[in-house]
Amino acid sequence: MENRKREKGAPFIEIKDLSYAYPGEEGRGQQVLSHINLTIREGEYTVILGHNGSGKSTLAKLINLVIDDYTYAEGQILVGGRDVMADDLAEKDLLELRRQVGMVFQNPDNQLVATIVEEDVAFGPENLGISNPELRERVDAALATVGMSEYAHHEPHRLSGGQKQRVAIAGIIAMKPRCMIFDESTAMLDPLGRREVLATMEKLNREEGITVLSITHYMDEAARADRVIVLSDGQILLDGTPGEVFAHADTLRTAGLDVPQCTAAVQYLQARGVCIRGDLNTPEQCAAALLDAWRTRGGAGRTQAGK
């Protein structure tokens, strides 16, 4: 599928004919990924969609080296040109690869390690050997980026879910990654927390230039990305801009997914002759397109065929 927004920069993550199965009790276990070929470029905001068991989280953990048992793995995963599955990777190389690709998990409580917010943010860079005054600068800058500066001296356990997740994100930012993977990072949050974290993700990509790879099953989150990849049963089913992917509503349904509600509503109207043009992925875009159609057709908004 053509992707008009894909050319962001040089390839940063390259996955070549990757297949993976988890080790079982008696050898090879369940096949999770099959012949994945994928390139993520510097500066892209990419969402990987899929139902439970599609392989999306396994793929993310392989990229970040959270999973490092390659007994039943085939193919290559290149991060910044380095093969993360190579047998000759030294420990320092593994640490550097993990620094370049930070990961934010579903439950922030599992990622927070200190009793004070700023100490938690400092934990990662301290372990990289960063000391003051640079450490202080990194912590302050990271908290400012996620809008949590005023909570620097608070206890993490007293924060809301969205605030905790932003602190976890700040801890990754302080290590200055080139890419951040968000693995279902909004799944446990209330609507306000989700909005806070999504706004932070967009800011990191649009303003800081960080490559963002978001693993989710929320279609409205995918609508705001540059690129959407749909996994089903360990294989890439669709790959394109949000609009291109959402145009394949029937294919999405076979994968246990659906288009965003606002997009479905517009598609329903289009199928009945209403002329609606433009990007139709977010509620704001759909509302603007509907209003434009109403104005253009003097309140009718119908094509000649629909009259």
Identify the function of each model-found stretch:
Residues 83, 133-151:
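Conserved ABC ATPase "signature" region
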Residues 155-159, 163:
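Conserved ABC ATPase signature
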Residues 2-15, 20-35, 67-70, 87-93, ...:
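A short, flexible loop at the N-terminus of ABC-type nucleotide-binding domains that lies
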Residues 180-183:
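Catalytic Walker B motif of ABC-type/P-loop ATPase nucleotide-binding domains
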Residues 76-96:
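ABC ATPase NBD Q-loop/coupling interface
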Residues 176:
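Conserved catalytic motifs of ABC-family nucleotide-binding domains
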